[in-house]
Amino acid sequence: MVGTTTTDVPPTMGVKIFSAGVAACLADVITFPLDTAKVRQQIQGEFPITSGIRYKGVLGTITTLAKTEGPLKLYSGLPAGLQRQISFASLRIGLYDTVQEFFTSGEETPSLGSKISAGLTTGGVAVFIGQPTEVVKVRLQAQSHLHGLKPRYTGTYNAYRIIATTESLTSLWKGTTPNLLRNVIINCTELVTYDLMKGALVRNEILADDVPCHFVSALIAGFCTTLLSSPVDVVKTRFINSPPGQYASVPNCAMTMFTKEGPTAFFKGFVPSFLRLGSWNVIMFVCFEKLKGELMRSRQTVDCAT
């Protein structure tokens, strides 16, 4: 299981939730420029007014952003991103083992079905709770002051207020459907692949349950997740970032992309998306496993002392 550590005592649900939140925030801080590059590539070609600047490749996108809008633009939306990890990743990852045990129904070895069911459940709940932070994060990453475009928002909390007052409170949940589909795919693929890879490596004595095992499992999980979730991710980003009335619905957004830009539009930003998700997975899972272990060892030490 994702929650298994090398300590004798299994981590509590609270330890898992806390560890997942902290590890996810650390991973977000380190990989956020890649996420911003992914968003910019995904919306490229949507508005003719921004056609003066073209983003080419991961490094090209990052350097172009830094030169034209300043290095800090790479971290625009980070506060909302951290809020997202606290409300989203802590639940979808931290609750995974607990929910999986519920679906296992006393079975000694969790089935693939119980793993997928756990991923679907925790991913769905986390998306609904964390969607407002996702909307604000994407819009702050996407907005640009170039070519006469006036930024819609001056900061994180200003974005929450303007979206709620000028559009509607429900607009903070805009794009919930594609984001739900995206994160159900991500959660199931990411956690189940990591779980299966880690179990196979340890069970077959290829690697011990330590950093190298966590690294390999997380990287493979990141690639599989990016491949399956990319089309939905691009549609989600376009729909969330769109002004009111641009797209009639999520299917209309997808169809507009297909007819105007072709099928390759659904894989825009794939490389930065994989680099971001792959590195995010490695950092998050390695820190998650280590933090859980240290917290449980500290707890055992305190219990022994008392």
Curated annotation (Swiss-Prot):
First and last residues of every Solcar repeat: 11-102, 110-200, 209-294
Keyword presence, Amino-acid biosynthesis: no
PTM annotation, UniProt: May undergo sulfenylation upon cold exposure. May increase the sensitivity of UCP1 thermogenic function to the activation by noradrenaline probably through structural effects. May undergo ubiquitin-mediated proteasomal degradation.
Catalysis performed (reactions): H(+)(in) = H(+)(out)
Keywords annotated in UniProt: Ion channel, Ion transport, Membrane, Mitochondrion, Mitochondrion inner membrane, Oxidation, Repeat, Transmembrane, Transmembrane helix, Transport
Broad class of the protein's primary localization: mitochondrion
Protein's membrane topology: Multi-pass membrane protein
GO MF assignments: cardiolipin binding; long-chain fatty acid binding; oxidative phosphorylation uncoupler activity; purine ribonucleotide binding
Transmembrane region(s): 11-32, 74-96, 116-132, 178-194, 212-231, 266-288
Quaternary state and interactors: Most probably functions as a monomer. Binds one purine nucleotide per monomer. However, has also been suggested to function as a homodimer or a homotetramer. Tightly associates with cardiolipin in the mitochondrion inner membrane; may stabilize and regulate its activity.
Name the record gives this protein: Mitochondrial brown fat uncoupling protein 1
